Amino acid sequence: MERAPEDAGPQREPYNEWALELLEELKNEAVRHFPRIWLHGLGQHIYNTYGDTWEGVEAIIRILQQLLFIHYRIGCQHSRIGITPQRRRNGTSRS
């Protein structure tokens, strides 16, 4: 009968500590790019939906990651990652 491999890897940081550190980093980055009132509203929505649970922490992490990714992708003034508008060969831009 097969056995699961032994966990011989390096000791990992507990998930909840890692998640809280990640959330703190995302919040610090988000306040640089979005109005605080929006972020407060997002936090209220998550709290009303999930309460004070790890599921809520995971949800807000996922949403903040998506918001920041899209924000950078469409052209954040603070970032060099954004899309640069490209012109077509005939000189018109896409609409």
Swiss-Prot record:
The modification Phosphoserine is found at S79, S93, S95. GO terms for cellular component: host cell; host cell nucleus; host extracellular space; virion component. One of its GO terms (biological process) is regulation of DNA-templated transcription. Residues 1-42 are annotated as: Homooligomerization. HIV-1 lineages are divided in three main groups, M (for Major), O (for Outlier), and N (for New, or Non-M, Non-O). The vast majority of strains found worldwide belong to the group M. Group O seems to be endemic to and largely confined to Cameroon and neighboring countries in West Central Africa, where these viruses represent a small minority of HIV-1 strains. The group N is represented by a limited number of isolates from Cameroonian persons. The group M is further subdivided in 9 clades or subtypes (A to D, F to H, J and K). Belongs to the HIV-1 VPR protein family. HAMAP family: HIV_VPR. During virus replication, may deplete host UNG protein, and incude G2-M cell cycle arrest. Acts by targeting specific host proteins for degradation by the 26S proteasome, through association with the cellular CUL4A-DDB1 E3 ligase complex by direct interaction with host VPRPB/DCAF-1. Cell cycle arrest reportedly occurs within hours of infection and is not blocked by antiviral agents, suggesting that it is initiated by the VPR carried into the virion. Additionally, VPR induces apoptosis in a cell cycle dependent manner suggesting that these two effects are mechanistically linked. During virus entry, plays a role in the transport of the viral pre-integration (PIC) complex to the host nucleus. This function is crucial for viral infection of non-dividing macrophages. May act directly at the nuclear pore complex, by binding nucleoporins phenylalanine-glycine (FG)-repeat regions. This is Protein Vpr. It comes from Human immunodeficiency virus type 1 group N (isolate YBF30) (HIV-1). The lineage of its organism: Viruses, Riboviria, Pararnavirae, Artverviricota, Revtraviricetes.
